[in-house]
């Protein structure tokens, strides 16, 4: 069985894959020059718009932050950065795998693509663990529900992903062939076996382990929520039914967006080290390219999940009074013209002080209370 650099010898008929770098099989993948620019372009526009709106709510409308809102804020940041990394890839694939920019920019774009993808996965995991503790250990979750703990966890997540993705800057490079410059998604032939080993470690640490944690958390929560409460007669309360539906939706979105992408990418990389037929490799390569847009779509679906699953957050964002002018966030929002005028706020406060106090008391979470997603 041939392995290593020998696999890059020889040619067959077909269309060259920009990531293959002289690989012995030439894959038929003209479809990706339409699919990837179109899908990445849509994700870029929607992802930036939706996550920018979410960030505005977090920064300019919410007065009280806890662990849940902190994780959601960082999730929105990672999704927005992910969407912002797509325009150059749209241009690259629309030009037929031609990269007219520098090698350093190629490394940076690929690095940002995967860094923010895995940050999104880990922040979804943090939200799931936090919700699980709130359902299974509500008293203990009060201690860990403060924003200061969540900020430490968020910093650890960013540090972990940046450290794990740093080797990608070494592997990824560009090559010039036939007047075309390719920004590779893998590595040079002599480093490919090391790149596959690195990718498998990243798969285990940044996808498989978080996915297993999410499955366990939601299984435990579903079991607790489906348990009939003492003294109730038949059927689940409406709140519990909604929570169970939310669990199913989050799991479905996570599995739809991330699972196919990681499975096909792992098979694609692994099969290239084996002496398989080019037809088999072409099929798995096609599947891998098709699942790329699914992984990207998660940055558009996360903001929708915030508002579909968290009606309290929507009500809080709609009704809460903006922060006072003393806060840096409020000052920034005022400079951008995003806050209501001071005179309007003053008049509204004078005319409805009692009703405003009553409404704020109703919607502001108590200390340690979680905004459930």
From Swiss-Prot:
The keyword Cell membrane applies. GO terms for biological process: blood vessel diameter maintenance; G protein-coupled receptor signaling pathway; phospholipase C-activating G protein-coupled receptor signaling pathway; positive regulation of mucus secretion. Residues 320-373 are annotated as: Disordered. CDD domains: 7tmA_P2Y2. Disulfide bonds join 106-183. It is a multi-pass membrane protein. Residues 342-373 have a biased composition (Basic and acidic residues). Induction: Up-regulated in stented coronary arteries (at protein level). It is found in: Cell membrane. Residues 61-70, 130-152, 221-243 are cytoplasmic. Keywords: Cell membrane, Disulfide bond, G-protein coupled receptor, Membrane, Receptor, Transducer, Transmembrane, Transmembrane helix. This is P2Y purinoceptor 2. Receptor for ATP and UTP coupled to G-proteins that activate a phosphatidylinositol-calcium second messenger system. The affinity range is UTP > ATP. Its main location: membrane. The chain crosses the membrane at residues 40-60, 71-91, 109-129, 153-173, 200-220, 244-264. GO terms for cellular component: plasma membrane. Signal peptide: none annotated. Belongs to the G-protein coupled receptor 1 family. Expressed in heart, kidney, intestine, skeletal muscle and adrenal gland.
